[in-house]
A protein has these predicted regions:
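Conserved PLP-enzyme active-site core in the AAT-like
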Residues: 1-75, 159-160, 187
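Glycine- and other small-residue-rich loops at beta-strand/loop junctions that grip anionic moieties
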Residues: 11-14, 90, 94, 116, ...
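Residue-level detector of functional hotspots within protein domains
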Residues: 11, 16, 41, 99, ...
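Long, C-terminal catalytic modules of enzymes
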Residues: 50-54, 58-96, 100-107
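Non-catalytic terminal extensions of PLP-dependent enzymes
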Residues: 23, 73, 77, 84-88, ...
Length: 252
């Protein structure tokens, strides 16, 4: 429908971890794609950055790409197409991050790439099925590489929010999942085990989440105070929002 109306389709590479090596976004009808290298291709992200997100497109859009494009095989040259939108940046992003992603792809190989995706999907479904008798699943069906829990019912019953459960995970040595996303799910926790976790670590995470649910029902205040074992305890988010420090204060 979009193509018939003269539009183009854009693929968010954040979900590629579930399908890489199995399907081709171009064959699915997409014209442009960005790749989240930190999510699918094992590169650093955020505080461990820098992040990087290469953009790919179909051949019909190549004449319009920003300049300069590297062309050639034996000898490389910079090319600027007549219809190019011109220069956007004076550099080509975080090159070393792209090299690391390429190394990861070549290490996995043709068989390893789809296997990684299949393991990611398997791990997510395993965890979801181990938790759905306690936690409410936003979408109670077979998932891809991640699943979303809604803690809205738990909050109404006990006063414990998704934030409280996330903080409780820290006290148990587990990094919290993505909180409050997607925005359309109330009290959301989006869990993405990834392909690298073993059954043992998945079972450990499930055990902790089930324990936190029990604590929410029996001793909610314990989770309201969490984390208590980390070097930095719970931040005053309201105070930070109302009285932000936006620049460093130099000492006289």
């Amino acid at each position: 429908i979009v193509h018939n109306c003269g539009g183009l389709c854009y693929y968010d590479g954040a979900n590629l971890n579930a399908v890489m090596g199995t399907v081709c976004p171009g064959d699915m009808g997409f014209d442009v794609i960005h790749l989240n290298l930190h999510k699918t291709f094992s590169t650093p992200h955020g505080g461990g950055g820098p992040g990087s997100g290469p953009v790919g497109c179909k051949s019909m859009l190549v004449p319009f790409l920003p300049s300069y494009v590297v062309d050639g095989e034996e000898e490389l040259e910079f090319v600027k197409e007549p219809q190019s939108i011109g220069e956007m940046k004076s550099f080509y992003g975080n090159f070393t991050v792209i090299v690391k992603a390429l190394t990861y792809v070549k290490t996995l190989g043709r068989e390893g790439i789809p296997e990684a995706s299949q393991n990611a999907v398997l791990n997510a479904n395993y965890m979801m099925n181990k938790l759905k008798d306690l936690y409410t699943m936003a979408y109670d069906e077979v998932c891809m590489h991640e699943f979303v829990m809604s803690l809205a019912d738990l909050k109404k019953k006990t006063g414990i929010s998704a934030m409280d459960i996330a903080k409780g995970l820290l006290d148990n040595g587990i990094h919290p999942p993505t909180m409050y996303f997607p925005l359309i799910v109330e009290e959301a926790l989006m869990v993405e085990p990834t392909e690298t976790e073993s059954k043992e670590t998945l079972d450990e995470a499930v055990e902790v989440l089930r324990k936190l649910y029990e604590i929410a029902e029996t001793d909610a205040e314990q989770l309201h105070q969490a984390p208590v074992t980390t070097p930095v305890t719970r931040m005053d988010e309201v105070g930070a929002a109302r009285h932000p420090y936006l620049r460093y204060e130099w000492q006289d």
